[in-house]
Amino acid sequence: MERVRGLVELLRPGNAVAAGGLTFIGAFVAGGLSSPQSMAFAVVATVLATGAGNAINDYFDRDIDAINEPDRPIPRGAVSPRGALVYSVALFAVAVVLTLLLPWLAIAIAAINLVALVAYTEVFKGLPGVGNALVAYLTGSTFLYGGAAVGGDLAAVVVLFALAACATMAREIVKDVEDIDGDRAEGLRTLPIVIGERRSLYVAAGFVVVAVLSSPLPYLLGLFGWVYLVVLVPALCGLAAATWRSFSDPTTGQAWLKASMFAAAVAFVIGRLAVVA
C-alpha cells in the first residue's frame, strides 16, 4: 500500500491535474468546445506528461530532496529510483500516443516540451535562471498546446502564454530563494545563490511587471470585451500582492503567485465566454 501511495505522490496529482486544467483553458480560449475529442486527448496527455515529468524530476532530485523534502517517496523508500524512472517512461509513452492523434502543431509543441523537460531535469535545473526559464516556458506552453490541439485562433492564447510564462518565471525564482539552503548544500548555482536573494526577488518582480503589462492586450486588440478586464483586475492585484509578500515570506509569496496566475487564466475563459455568449 505504501508503494501505491508513493507512486501517486510522485505524480504530484494536484499539480498534474492543474496542468491539465491549463490545457483545457488554452483549448477553450482558442476554439470553445468545437473539438471535444481533441480537447480531451490533449488534457489527458498533459496530465500524464506532467505526472511523468514530476516523477523523473524526483528521480534526478533524490539527493536534494533528502535534504529539502525527506518525506518525498524516493528519500523515504516508498519507491526505488529505478521504479520511479520506469514509471515516468510508461506515463510519457501513453501521453505520446494520445498526442499523435492531434494536429501537427500540437505534436510539434509536445515534442519541443519533451526535449525541454528532459533537458531541465538532467542538465539545466541547477544553472542560474536557465532552469527557471525552461519551467516558465513549459507552464505557459500548456495553453499553446491546448489551443493547437483544437486548431483554433491562437492570438489570445499567445498572450496567455506570455502572461503565464512571466508569472511562472517569477514564482520559480521565489521558490529558489525559499530552497536556497538545500540547493547550496547540493552545490547548485541557482539565481539566488549567484546574485543574492534580494536581487533575485527584484528580478522576479520585473517579470511580474511584464506579465501585468501584457495582460490587457486581448482587450486592446479587440479579442475580448470589458468583462475580461473586470475579472482580470483582481488577478493582477493578487500578482502585485504576491510579489510584495515574497520579499518577507517567499513561501507564502510563491503560493500567492501560483493562485493569481490561475485567476488570470480564468479571466481569459470568462473573456472567451462573453464573446461566444
Curated annotation (Swiss-Prot):
Subcellular localization, as worded in the UniProt entry: Cell membrane
InterPro entries (UniProt xref): DGGGP_synth (IPR023547), Prenyltransferase_related (IPR050475), UbiA_prenyltransferase (IPR000537), UbiA_sf (IPR044878)
Keywords annotated in UniProt: Cell membrane, Lipid biosynthesis, Lipid metabolism, Magnesium, Membrane, Phospholipid biosynthesis, Phospholipid metabolism, Transferase, Transmembrane, Transmembrane helix
Functional note: Prenyltransferase that catalyzes the transfer of the geranylgeranyl moiety of geranylgeranyl diphosphate (GGPP) to the C2 hydroxyl of (S)-3-O-geranylgeranylglyceryl phosphate (GGGP). This reaction is the second ether-bond-formation step in the biosynthesis of archaeal membrane lipids.
Family: Belongs to the UbiA prenyltransferase family. DGGGP synthase subfamily.
Catalytic activity: sn-3-O-(geranylgeranyl)glycerol 1-phosphate + (2E,6E,10E)-geranylgeranyl diphosphate = 2,3-bis-O-(geranylgeranyl)-sn-glycerol 1-phosphate + diphosphate
Name listed for the protein in its UniProt record: Digeranylgeranylglyceryl phosphate synthase
GO cellular component terms attached to this protein's record: plasma membrane
Annotated pathway: Membrane lipid metabolism; glycerophospholipid metabolism
Gene3D superfamilies for this protein: UbiA prenyltransferase (1.20.120.1780)
Bilayer-crossing regions: 13-33, 40-60, 89-109, 143-163, 199-219, 220-240, 256-276
